Amino acid sequence: MEYFENRDRAESFGEAAQDYDAFRPKYPAALVAAIMEAAEASAGPDDRAPRILDVGSGTGILASQLRTAGAEILAVEPDPAMAELARPKGLEVEVSAFEDWDPQSRTFDLVSFGQSFHWVDPSVALPTIRTVLTPGGTLALAWNDIEPIGELKTRLDATAARFHTDGRTASLGTAGAEDTFAHVEHPAIAQLRGAGFSPKETTFVDNLHYSKHDWLSMVFTYSAQLTMDPVKRAVMREEMSAEIPEDGLDARNEALLVLASA
């Protein structure tokens, strides 16, 4: 089953909107700068702010970073609870699944997806993206992928595996097998090429430190945990907590950016 076909997981985030906004990470500054460079190139030399459509915007984490960097943003988000947390950040948000969204003849220099492209049907989304991009416009797909550093990762993965016997792990990775980052071509690349886009991948690495509370709070905003039985989820959190030192953990974000020209 593709991620976008699993509606229980795709529609699970609203119940955790506050924690999602508080604990999901921002994107590396260099990744945001790369998106802005592409958007400004698409906008041309007339000194206007680049227009960006941010799809599956959630609580506006990526969108607010792009707005701060100087872009004019329209966010599209299917979950009303998530959208309500994005609007106070100064974002215009339209509540809709992207597959049902009406562009109303509007066009954009860049279309971005932050941690969200896997939740849309590419056979519907990619043709729509083509219609809303200005000539020379760019599609940007971004995923944060944060893992503990060292042997703690092995212990936490083993704990997650005991609770997710279907092969899911605690977070959504960006490439290779489901929920696991691997240094192989991202599966979206073939979808983009098949739709006539020319994609290029870049990875941005940030070294991070998390308190025990913040790490666990982040992990339990992922759909693999949000769709668990609540009692089972609480036990999993307790067992993971027992593995993490009181002073927290070091982690690495290998954030992936795919820029694709139409």
Model regions and ranges:
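A short SAM/SAH-binding and catalytic strip from SAM-dependent methyltransferases
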Residues: 109-123
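A structural alpha-helix within SAM-dependent methyltransferase catalytic domains
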Residues: 36, 64-67, 126, 130
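A short acidic, Gly/Pro-enriched loop at the edge of an enzyme's catalytic core
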Residues: 100-111
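Conserved catalytic/acceptor-binding region of the Class I
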Residues: 124, 130, 134-205
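Class I SAM-dependent methyltransferase SAM/SAH-binding core
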Residues: 51-55, 59-101
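Conserved Class I S-adenosyl-L-methionine
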Residues: 179-262
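Residues lining the SAM
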Residues: 76, 113-114, 142-144
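Conserved class I S-adenosyl-L-methionine
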Residues: 1-47
